[in-house]
Structure formats: structure tokens, C-alpha cells
């Protein structure tokens, strides 16, 4: 309808009335809620144990698995160290897995061997001491999934005598120090522990204002809140990919603490280390 300049028309003169707009808004909101709910279901962290451990959890009084030690390796070099220096002993069995989905982790599969999986969190249990669990995590755990990961993993374990050890790597460029990083003996280890962790550590403690993030930080914070003794070993390196030099930088950890009694024979270590590095080189060459 024609009108003169400056006249204010009623909103009901528009082609779509308010009731139709409200219906459209309600439909959009309902669709948004369904999308959000579907994403939440898709991003849920799921912990699966093998049938034997599932039965043990169900039969225990607190519905939790007896556990004295959890060793968590995060990233290629940390999992490479665990594969070569600990799992190569052969006295381990697949115990379970953590599966999740996010923008950087879309296909998590449980591995049947001891090589680092390309995208998974796999649990192994010591055959000689069934209370010792080891977890290799090569997949990215998104920020909104970190709390879920900690709650569901540690919610399955008896915590009364539990100790936690976490291993990971970080670019040396992120290490904060008054001196130049060029003068540092890269790679090198730093440790960060909870207030309940009383054992000596075989490397210097991480100095302020350095911080840790991701899954190691979430696990350490979770243990601090629950009063679980935990220590995190961070290897600072100038090599981003998996390599034997960075893997070997973790060797001082085998001289003390809970890892000392888990070391494999030297022959098995060297053979597995060679295979691990060679396999990574072959996979890297596929993209050249």
C-alpha cells in the first residue's frame, strides 16, 4: 500500500504475520536442539573394557576395577617409548579402549598389536601384575571431552592405592626460560606432580610460568582434586614427528618409580624401536 514519506506502518501490514514468524522460530529452535543433542551424543566419550574386566568390575563391591598404577602415554613419541621399552616385553594384554569422535579424531579402533594406533586410546593390562594398566593415546581429545575422559576412565578404577604416571611431548619453542632455547640440551625432560605424589623424580621439576594443557593437564588436575598421587613427565623436543632421539629421552624414567620394574629386555627394546620408527617413516613417505 502506498504511503507518504515518514509514516509508520503497523507490523501486521507485512507479508508474514507474527504467528507465522513464531511458528518458524519454534521450528528452527526445535531443529537446533535436535542438532545439538545429536552432536552431544556423537561427541560422547565411551570406555569399553574386555569381557574379563567387565565381569570383574560388575562383581566388585564398588563396581570398580582394582588398580595400583595407571601409565598414560599421549602422542607419538610417548607411545613410541612405551611400545618399545615396556610393551615389547610381551607380558601385556589388551584390556579395553576409549572411543571418541571430534573434528580431528573420526575413526578410533582398538589395536590388537603393540604399535601405536593412528587414532585411538587403547588400554593394556600387565599379565604379571593385573593391577597395572597402561594407556596409549594417539587421538586428539577435544577440550569439551577432557572432563568426560577423566570421569569415565577413573570412575571405573579403585582409587584407594592408585598412582598415575603421564608421559607426553611438547615443542621446545613453548618452553619459557630466561635463556635462549638454542642453548638447551634438546630433548630434555621436566616433571610436574600433584601434592600427594611423594616419590623422587629423575628429572628437574617444571618451572613457572610454564604450563601444560590438553589431556595431561586434565588428568593431573583430576588427580589433584581427588587426592590421587600423580606425576607428569613432559619431554621438550625440537622434532615434531616420531623419532628415536625423542623416544630415548624418556629412558631416565626407567631408573626409578613405577616404571622401573616394567622395562622390557634390551633385545626386545631395540627391535621394537627400530620397527616403530621404520613404520612411521614408511607412512610419512606416502604423503611425499
UniProtKB/Swiss-Prot annotation:
One of its GO terms (molecular function) is proteasome binding. Residues 17-33 have a biased composition (Acidic residues). It is found in: Cytoplasm; Endoplasmic reticulum. The keyword RNA-binding does not apply. Keywords: Chaperone, Cytoplasm, Endoplasmic reticulum. Its main location: cytoplasm. Forms a heterodimer with psmg2. Belongs to the PSMG1 family. This is Proteasome assembly chaperone 1. It comes from Xenopus laevis.
